[in-house]
């Protein structure tokens, strides 16, 4: 049972300015179109192959698709051609490849840099503020990449205080870089922690289970 409307209302109560991305990974195109009919316009997908299967034959002109999962370098070309934004850029090498592929097809691609705010070994993302700042500087040399801001995933386990600590750390970093690079997007918060993320300054939350139900 798809219920985008209810979740959108809950998010709006917390902040009317926050963008709600419907995480549609593993969900059918039928479910995605039902969410679209209920007002969803931004969808988050984890895998490039799945994006190909769902959207290669087209989609409504006002529907946006964001890649939110890890991107392997051999999938960059396909990803750049299919999505509006890549939210999981975790290395300068990947950023450079995205820039090259976007330039080849003369497409400006939006990106977010992923920050590993919790320092967990099993997570991807830039681990230090210095590395992340270097990636920001490098992005200025890429004519077809539009760096919009940062993304982070809260610590495993849904401990509210640990989530808050990680989100506030990312928010401080975002605030320090915003005046230099014109950042506008701080993507933090998923189904279990989005309210805390909004309290900490998130401008985009990514919610799947509450909209689409459990895994298909």
What are these regions (language model features)?
Residues 204:
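Conserved, well-ordered active-site substructure
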Residues 195-199, 207, 211-216:
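Expand to "…catalyze enediolate/carbanion chemistry for C-C bond making/breaking, isomerization
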Residues 1-192, 198-200:
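Conserved alpha/beta-domain cores
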